[in-house]
C-alpha cells in the first residue's frame, strides 16, 4: 500500500492541531511515530512511500517499506535535496528509490487534450501552456535516472485525447530509448554526507503543506541549529527555498557550484554507512552520545 504524501499532510494538518503540543523534539518524534504506526497497521504494514517532504528516514526505519520516492515539480520542494534525503535513507535501510515528475504547478497543469481549458492562474485548469514546463520535466526525468532510481516517469498527460503521444509522452519515450542505448548510468558518486540530528524534525523553510514558515515537526519554530541546516543546504543548492513559488521555475533544480555531491543522513546512521562517505558534514546540533561513533571515522 502507498503512503503517499502523508508526511506533508501530517506536518500541515495534524501537527499544528496536536494537544498538548509538547516542546520536546523527542516527544514530537514519538507523536509522529504513533501516527504512522497506526497508518501502517491499518494498511497491512507492507508499504511504499511517495514522500512530500523529507521524512523518509523515519518511514524506512520501521522495516515495512519496499520502495521510496518523491513527486517533483508541482508545488513541491527542490528535487536535488529531496533525493539527497531519499538516497541517504535508501542506502541506510536497503530500500530502492524511484523518480516521479509532476505536470502540475501552483497555477494549473499541462494538458494537450482538445478539451483543455487553459484558464490562467486556475489550479484546476489544464492547457498546453500551463503546468510544469517541458524543459523542467525533461531535466527531472534524466536527473532521476542519474540518481540511481529503479523506475522513473511522469504522473500523466502523456497522450493527446488517448490517440497519440503528447510532447510529455515523447520525452518519456525518448528516455526509454536512451536507457536502451546507453544502459545503466552507473552508481552515482556522492562523497559528502550531511548529518542532522535524528530527533530534529527539520524540514524545508517553506513548502506547499503549510503557510507557516521555518517550522520543525510542523509546529515548533526553527532554532539556531535548524538555520545551520538550511544554510548548509543552501551552500550546496543555492536558492533551493524558491522551488515552486515562481513561474520561472527557479529552485527546483539549482545551479549548484559543486554538483549533486551529497546525501543526507541522520545521527542514527551506523558506522558502516558513514564509512561510505569520505566527507561527513555535521549540519545540525546532535544529541549527546554520538561522539564515539563519529570519532571512529578517523
PLM region descriptions:
Residues 1-298:
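Glycan-processing catalytic domains of CAZymes
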